[in-house]
């Protein structure tokens, strides 16, 4: 069984992330969306909330699971008995960073491959950071995030502004 792990912070999950998950689900027997717990970074959503939001978006896929992890990605990959780390690439800048990480992961566990998937052109400009910035200035975000979580994101932005 081919198991791929797609790691990230997903704060929030974007249409670009979801597109990659959908494409990976068609290539692997099982895809684990691995939500990174970064204690040094205050997210818009808690880890539990992010896991729940992603689960709402991927509910229709029988071969996609969502889990959180902390520590080394490679340790999580081994624990889940996965073969592959799945990484999305939007730009050359993404590639430079992800290439270095792939080499480091190969050094730590040469049995695990990293597969790079190029982001669909219509999502290549979308990032969680950009979405948060647009939302913080009352901009329209529904074109950037999966429809399943638009309301959740709008409610969170309102509460952060003190409107809710």
Curated annotation (Swiss-Prot):
Superkingdom of origin organism: Bacteria
Alphabetical list of InterPro entries matching this protein: Cyt_trans-like (IPR004821), PPAT (IPR001980), Rossmann-like_a/b/a_fold (IPR014729)
Pathway assigned to this chain's UniProt record: Cofactor biosynthesis; coenzyme A biosynthesis; CoA from (R)-pantothenate: step 4/5
Reactions catalysed according to its record: (R)-4'-phosphopantetheine + ATP + H(+) = 3'-dephospho-CoA + diphosphate
Annotated EC: 2.7.7.3
Gene Ontology MF: a single term: ATP binding
Chain positions recorded as ATP binding sites: 9-10, 17, 88-90, 98, 123-129
Cofactor(s) recorded in Swiss-Prot or TrEMBL: Mg(2+)
GO cellular component, one term: cytoplasm
Keyword Manganese: no
Record protein name field: Phosphopantetheine adenylyltransferase
Protein source organism: Clostridium perfringens (strain ATCC 13124 / DSM 756 / JCM 1290 / NCIMB 6125 / NCTC 8237 / Type A)
Name of encoding gene: coaD
